[in-house]
């Protein structure tokens, strides 16, 4: 039976599972949750959701940026990065907040039992990203390993944070539906959430009792 979220139809809610793509599916149908991979453009709320999921399930939140970026924004060499992440995903439980597909391929999502795609509207993610970045820049907030936001890194060039966020948002919408409907993900629960409200409702229905081995 297909049900909406709350009292409104959840036409934008999709779950990919063993029965294929199901629009408007009940988020309570998610199976045992122990390894969660979260994907989404910058500003979509990955870190916030990962923190909440990790606390709810009693597993660590793995912030991949903190592993990948060393001091002065140096990047860990790809072979070393992949080896480190292979160790991470071999653990019994975790919530991982970035996929890094260009360097890791499908390593993280294929190791997960549940994949959450935060597909919020671009204007929402960009507004959130602008507020977050401005706050970090003004307060000189340390991100990872002594790194802080710079205006050059945020605003200028094709590799700027905003350009990157827009490109990833468009790329995900173009490629992820076909990817997650493919045979490699038939044993996964893949949840596509398109609003903050859907995120809250889904999180409320994923409790520690759904963790592997729970009563």
How would you label these PLM feature ranges?
Residues 3, 9-33:
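Extreme N-terminal, non-catalytic leader segments
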Residues 22-31, 56, 163-215:
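NTP-dependent small-molecule kinase module
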Residues 38:
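Hydrophobic anchor at the beta1->P-loop junction of P-loop NTPases
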Residues 46:
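Conserved lysine of the Walker
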Residues 60-115:
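Conserved nucleotide-sensing/catalytic segment adjacent to the nucleotide-binding pocket
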Residues 120-172:
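A glycine- and Lys/Arg-enriched "phosphate-lid" helix/loop adjacent to the NTP-binding pocket
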